[in-house]
Amino acid sequence: MDQDKVAFLLELEDKLAKIRSQVNSKLENQKHIAIILTAVEENIAGQATNDVSKNIVNYIISFMSLLDQAVDPSTHEIKDIQLASSSTYLLDLIFHYSPKVLLRSKFSEILTKIAPCITAEKANAPLIRAAIGCLESLLIAQDAQAWNNTYDLNVTPKRGLQGILELSLDVRPKVRKRALDAVHAVLLNPPVAPTAEHVAAVFVADFCDKQLAGILNDLSNLSNKQLKAQKTKEDINASVMRSLRLITSVVSTGQWPSSQIEPLCDVLLGVTKSSEQYLVSASFECFESMFKTMAETTISSGLAENKYLRVLDTIFALKPSNVDTLLTKSWIAVVIKGMSTYATHQPLKALRKIPGVFHIMCTYLASETPEVYQAASQCLISILSESVKDDLLLYTPSVDEKVFKNVDEIISQIAKTFIDFLSIRYSHCSREILKILVAAFNKFRYRSNPHFLKSLKIVDTWRVNEEQFMDLRNEIELVIGASISAMGPEMILAEAPLNLDNPSSERPGRAWLLPLIRDYTKNANLATFQNELAPYIKSFQSKFDKVPEESIQLRVFQTIVDQIWSTLPRFCELPMDLRESFTDEFASELSSLLYSEVELRTTICHALKVLAESNVSYAEESSSHNVLLLQRFPISEAQKNIEYLSTKSTNLLAVLFNVYTQTTPNARSYILETIDQYLKITSKEDLEKTFNNVCGLLKNSMNEESSGNVNKEKKKPQLTATLLDLIICMITYLPVSSYSALFSMFSLTVNSADALIQKRAYRIITKLSELKSGSTAVAQFISDIENVMVDSASSVQTSAKAARLTAIKTIVELLPLDHLDFIVRTVAEVILSTKDVNEKSRETAFDTLICMGRKMNEPNGIIKLFQIPGYDPTTPDQSSSISEFFKIISAGLIGESQHMVSSSITGYACLVFEFKNELDSGILMDIYDTIELYLTSNSREIVKSAIGFTKVCVLGLPEELMRPKVPELLLKLLRWSHEHTGHFKAKVKHIIERLIRRFGYDYIEANFPEEDRRLLTNIRKMRNRNKRKDEEVTTGVSDVAATKGSRFMSAFDEAVYGSDEENDNGSDQEENVAGGKMKNGAKQFIVESGDNPLDLLDSQTLAHISSTRPKKFNKNQNRARFNDDAFNFDSEGKLVVKGQPKPSTNVDDPLSAVTSGINAYLEAVKSGPVRGQRNKLKFRKNGKDSDEFGDDDDGEKDSRLMRGRVNQGNKIGKHNKKGPKFKSRKKL
């Protein structure tokens, strides 16, 4: 016996063993089956042999005899339903593993015995499902002769299959599912025959077609009255759905015969006319299953190729009328699915059919019905996007010469169709035609040239003739933009030149093309900018001096020049000719402009950055999905470009460094980003040389500063800080040999009196530690760095504290375990910083403190006490631990100043919250007892910190530790319950509320001092009141409260500074909110206008009832306030949302909002000066479309307005808050 057969029979044994184990099951049906199996196996135990086939036969005979006992032989009615179900279930299992010869020879006898289990009235779903399984195994075992009935059987296999097909339409879901699985399995296992098609395939397909066609016929014959009966309609729809599921199951086997394809398509398209969406969806699933199966069969064997084409041809032949909206949309969806599936498996053959699809869709695009021509346009867009594979669009030698010519011919045919589309015949759907053209350019890319040039010329004439085609301007510009991306700006400029210098009717000006070139250019030739656009810059700049200074013409010229410069970054995005066009001459020209033209620095720096960045990112891509770009511009070209740019980087960096030093600090982050990009591609030798040059400049700057020239020339310290910025930027790319110079620089600048220099000194350590090699270097010089950090503590500038604390945290993380004395020497400074006025310093101090605690808690740590000032040199080393760290901090509790004591308590609060689980409870309680004493201090600063610490303990420490401390804590806290300064009363009240919640009201009441009972009573009443309101509050208020986020950045902040106001039921805030909602909930308002008084008898009255007070508006009130492009108010005060403008593609580009030369001209006219009264020049005040003008007396008017604002209501006038200061994106 072979291995597969052994595994097959072992699988049967496993299933029988599982049934045997259910003999004690609580489910009666499982238990009965197990008992039957056990009884049968005991009966045949004496007949068991080594021949497994004979054992299977014994099982079949036994179970068949039991089935005979359960069925009445004369009436064929079932006498014992349970015995019949168990026997049939076991037969279903055994038949699956039985020899096919046996089932084939006994087919008629077995089928006759199993038939009553399906046809009897008493047959339930489990019995029918088991009988279907038996019938499935029987039918799979039959050969072609049996199916064709050459044996002259009384009951043929087709009769059994028909029974299963009828059950596949049964109303019972589980029976139907089992029958569908059986049909699927039978068709997937055809008998051996000359053809791969199952003998019964035509029979099954005919049954499916007739069944669905009959139901649809019944549906069409129903009267309107019957259709209105919901039950009748639902029953028919359910029957359609069951038939569709059967068809899908059959089609998915790949056995649907070719002769039945046309009737199937016809009937499925009939279903798509239904108004029920789920039926339409199910019919599409049938189509999709058919397409998918045929395509897979075509790939595997090639047998279904003609069948698939026949299906597509049938669908095209069944095209509906171009006025039938519903059917047309459904039919088009089937076309899309068929073409996309075909293209997945046969890309070239699918591409050959696309011109035919365009020809067919002409009929529907010519339709005057919007739904029809919109559906047709979406069809063509989808087919272009999904059915044209990029691999076919490659040039030779990547594709065969014959394929290349074939594809070229197909593209040419499609392009000719577009020329017809752009004719007057399709003028009603021009917008849709232009969208299809955009999809064509996006798909064919470089292959669009030269086939689509005629279409482009037609669209260009539309754009030039702006008056006639104004409503299509956006779509036209999308087409031209797509053509720029596809064929490159050089081809577009050749066909549609700018003509900016001397426009005329024969040579129309195309200033509107500049924003399109800016937005759509990519992977173009940099030479196009140099040869086509740059000459216009010089031409227009030469005209600046020839026109009046404040004239509109000058503003138009400046706008054009700005637009031309805005295209440079896009030409620098992975250019095709970088090595040929980015010459020394061009680079030096850009460099001189960086020095001379301040307003161009952003654009030129962005262009230089993109030039390097695009090549680096492209070269680092392991695999690109854009096969067309890969062929046109291989990755090796990008690598050559990087090597070429690296030879220019030294000079470019020198220019950028100089420009950086000349630019104000709040407006030069973009220069640093460009510098960073070129540092990345600079060779190690050049980088080291550049670094040495900067170090030399830094040394000179520092020498001049120290020699006293700083008093004469205030910019020198600024220069030092600027050079340090550059050095910090270079750290990431420096070789290890330069690290010693960095450490020297750090030690020289860390004690500088200038805060900017000091901050950058500390950032050297922080930046260096981010690198793996840098961390190693810091660890190597850790002793020297520690000494420098400790010695420089006295000279720290206030604004440099945060940078210093970050450096300390970095050093602590890198400390060796025998250098923990550094923590002891710097912890006092960190603790004091927890009370710093600067928020960033405070947050960094807390992070550093926690980092120190974790370092001290590491095993095998050693504190060398003799190295700490004040300790005897013979003092032995001390092992580190978190407990030892807490003891070290305790020295701060007896500090000389109140500020030190307060800071130490705050530090303890942070550390207890973080390390409460690692710390010994005895030490925790000692610290608590000590700090609790400070609640009796006369210093409010100390008490405030102590209250915060006790709150952390109350919330975080175990209940058994805190319960004994509560009585004494209450006495000390209540000393401050009458103190309003510094919110002491509120803080004490919140802690008591927390205590009540944690230890219970009774326990707190028992330990509460008698003289302060009023406070406790107040808290109790408030809690009870809030509980009652919680029960009454609406769901809406609960949702609002639930969605409110936490105001705190960390759990520690919430514990220390949070209160019941944020998350307790007993909060005053929630009480106010709930109370306010409840009080105002009953208020309602009637909205009416003077013209239309409210009719209380009208059915629409409820629409005029509002829960908020309506605003009254008149036509002239706040007119400017509502003059907005996005919003407006109607006569009743309701907000009306207009169309929002599309977001700009380039936020940083100030010219991105200018979409065309005409717009730029109008903008210049609007914002230009006009002559007012007394011949004074007036300018518009705001940048929008306001009609207000200002003149020389504006300042006086503003002062009068301000005085009126200040004096109004006898209140002090407050200026509006200014916006946030500019923050550099590049952090140093």
Swiss-Prot record:
A Pfam match: RRP12_HEAT
Annotated InterPro entries: ARM-like, ARM-type_fold, RRP12, RRP12-like_dom
GO MF, one example: RNA binding
Function: In association with GSP1, required for nuclear export of both pre-40S and pre-60S ribosomal subunits. Required for the late maturation of the 18S and 5.8S rRNA of the pre-40S ribosomes and for maturation of the 25S and 5.8S rRNA of the pre-60S ribosomes.
Amino acid composition bias (Basic residues), ranges on this chain: 1212-1228
Subcellular location: Cytoplasm; Nucleus, Nucleolus
This protein's name: Ribosomal RNA-processing protein 12
Main location: cytoplasm
Phosphoserine carried by residues: S1059, S1067
Keywords per UniProt: Cytoplasm, Nucleus, Phosphoprotein, Ribosome biogenesis, RNA-binding
Additional free-text comment from the UniProt record: Present with 8170 molecules/cell in log phase SD medium.
GO biological process terms, semicolon-separated: maturation of SSU-rRNA from tricistronic rRNA transcript (SSU-rRNA, 5.8S rRNA, LSU-rRNA); ribosome biogenesis
Gene behind the chain: RRP12
Subunit details: Interacts with GSP1.
Annotated region (Disordered), positions in chain: 1168-1228
Any single Gene Ontology cellular-component annotation: 90S preribosome
First and last residue of the signal peptide: none
Assigned protein family: Belongs to the RRP12 family.
Top-level taxonomic group: Eukaryota
Organism: Saccharomyces cerevisiae (strain ATCC 204508 / S288c) (Baker's yeast)
